[in-house]
Regions:
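ABC ATP-binding cassette signature C-motif
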Residues: 1-271, 315, 322-562
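Intracellular alpha-helical coupling/juxtamembrane segments of multi-pass membrane proteins
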Residues: 258-291, 295-301, 305-312
Length: 562
């Protein structure tokens, strides 16, 4: 429970600007209570990760003051965490309980000393060893350290960490994040800073993490685009909007309600301001020379109003998904498809039929075969048996997770345009800059080098590259990773307006609930279930089908016993 009388961290007038004089944080005043659960939201580039780095003590180049109450610890999960590549998964995870590991090591060292002549021949040294051994025994008993291995195994299983003996240097980006998160949760810092903690976690792991954080004694501050996570965990929302930090007491749904009302008020104010601007502009244009002095004063008034209008305007995000050729009734049908890698069977006798105008959400644990399914449909891999029947009118656009085809040394505009002002889309030519603007790349954003893009910007660019081909069937592999909540809404609206069929791999439950007409669920044990309805309806159906039998890992267990 949050203690609203114990402030453990404060920011006093904190501002942050980059070398290009862009101010991302402006005069932030905040105080965090012990035990509070805070979700940070805002557009990409609004300063969310910068704020986290300041709190973590990694960024000291700011104006203002940061005050920690003495005696409290801070732990930080970065988007790209640093791990020691010379260690194994278990060795890294054990760093989270280093004091326990050190206690066990010292206890073992003392036991070894009992057999050395320099100790057993010296009564004083033996007495000192016995005394220290007793102290360590009390610590070990109090922390249940003898069961450390089973506790670490439970922690790694909860977050789907790779095998404990796997070298860290061989891990993927997602695996590294899961290992780093496991290590951090075992440390139990008083202030837990999580930058996109749900990225690369499957739904079951996210459910487990939500329950763990709900019961977490310390303060949790999380940057995340997962709106269900914000609903279930956050008791406060901190919105970063045009440099300002706007706190709200409540979860995401309650914040969304007040945000809508606030935007309505801003629109009314903006409407009045626009009318005033129009009158001022008309007067300025018509003012005779005889009233030049007054004209200058009113021109200054006009400029002030214009600046306020620019300041108050919040950009409406839009992602445009062009419709491909008309899609017939036959889309893609899986018939008795099977696929295995060695002894690992991903699925056997897979059957489903994609709906012509549907949006199919693909869910399941990491490694279950979701991405493999897309690669099989695209012909990038071969089925072991069965087949995919593809309709004659189908034109597939595939957006994978890798983004390997983005040249980091080219600008956004160069990647999309190929050096041409017009790009060919179907039977028509489209202005390349206009096309990019439909994916929320403004004029200055279009000149950014791709190597400098954020994760969300790279996702939008990759989406624009794939959709340029005007497919009528979209295969989207984790398109919601690394993009902010506003961009997520724009993507949802773009998909809802899309006339073809979309198949989307995602762990974002809010996203799945809002747009999906069908769910293709990888349920474990090589079983795949095709369901017509939303994600929540699928979950209800799943509980009815399973009865009291819960799948492995659904039941919540504490990371470490107290």
């Amino acid at each position: 429970m949050a203690d609203d009388k114990k402030i453990i961290f404060s920011m006093v007038g904190v501002s942050k600007s980059f070398q290009n004089n862009k101010q991302v944080l402006k005069d932030i005043y905040l105080s965090f209570f012990y035990g509070a659960k805070i979700g940070i939201i805002g557009l990409n580039g609004s300063g969310k990760s910068t704020l986290m780095k300041i709190i973590a003590g990694l960024d000291k180049n700011y104006q203002g003051e940061v005050v920690f109450s003495p005696g409290y610890s801070v732990g930080y999960l970065a988007q790209e965490p640093h791990l020691d590549d010379t260690k194994t998964v278990k060795e890294v995870v054990m760093e989270g309980v280093q004091s326990v590991v050190d206690t066990l090591a010292e206890y073992e060292e003392i036991n070894n000393k009992f057999g050395l002549p320099e100790y057993y021949e010296d009564p004083e040294k033996m007495d000192a060893l016995f005394a220290r051994q007793a102290e360590l025994q009390d610590i070990i008993d109090a922390t249940d350290a003898w069961n450390l291995d089973s506790k670490l195994e439970r922690a790694m299983d909860a977050l789907r960490c790779p095998p404990e003996d796997q070298p860290v240097k061989n891990l993927s980006g997602g695996e590294r994040r899961r290992v780093a998160l496991c290590r951090l949760l075992l440390q139990k810092p008083d202030i837990l800073l999580l930058d996109e903690p749900t990225n690369h976690l499957d739904v079951e792991s996210i459910d487990w993490l939500e329950q763990h954080l709900q019961q977490y004694e310390g303060t949790v501050i999380a940057v995340t685009h997962d709106r269900y996570f914000l609903d279930h965990v956050a008791g406060w929302i901190l919105e970063l909007d045009r440099g300002e930090g706007i706190p709200w007491k409540g979860n995401y749904s309650s914040w969304l309600e007040q945000k809508t009302k606030r935007m309505e008020m801003e629109e009314k104010t903006a409407s009045k301001r626009r009318k005033t601007l129009e009158r001022e502009l008309e007067w300025v244009r018509m003012a005779p020379k005889a009233r030049q002095a007054k004209g200058k004063a009113r021109l200054n008034s006009y400029d002030k109003l214009l600046n306020e209008d620019v300041k108050e305007k919040e950009e409406k995000l839009e992602i445009f998904i062009p419709n491909g050729p008309r899609l017939g009734n036959k889309v893609i049908e899986a018939k008795h498809v099977a696929k295995a890698y060695g002894d690992k069977l991903l699925f056997d006798d897979l059957n489903f039929m994609l709906p012509p105008n549907g949006i199919v959400g693909v869910i399941g644990p990491n490694g279950a075969g979701k991405t493999t399914l897309f690669r099989l449909i695209m012909g990038l891999e071969k089925v072991d048996k069965g087949e995919f029947e593809v309709g004659e009118t189908v034109k597939v656009a595939y957006v994978d997770q890798q983004h390997k085809d983005i040249d980091p040394n080219k600008t956004v505009y160069q990647v999309i345009s190929g050096g041409n002002d017009l790009i060919r889309m179907g039977n028509r030519d489209v202005n390349a800059r206009a096309y990019l603007s439909r994916f929320n790349f403004s004029g200055s954003d279009q000149e950014k080098l791709c190597g400098m893009l954020s994760g969300g910007e790279r996702n939008r660019l990759h989406l624009a590259m794939a959709l340029k081909e005007e497919g009528n069937v979209l295969l989207l592999d984790e398109p919601t990773n690394d993009i902010d909540v506003n961009t997520l809404r724009a993507l949802e609206e773009g998909l809802e307006d899309f006339a073809g069929c979309a198949v989307v791999i995602s762990h974002d439950r809010w996203f799945l609930d809002r747009i999906c007409t069908h769910i293709l669920a990888f349920e474990g044990n090589s079983e795949v279930f095709f369901f017509e309805g939303s994600y929540t309806e699928y979950e209800e159906n799943k509980m009815k089908r399973m009865g009291n039998v819960e799948p492995k890992r659904v039941r919540y267990r504490k990371l470490m016993e107290d």
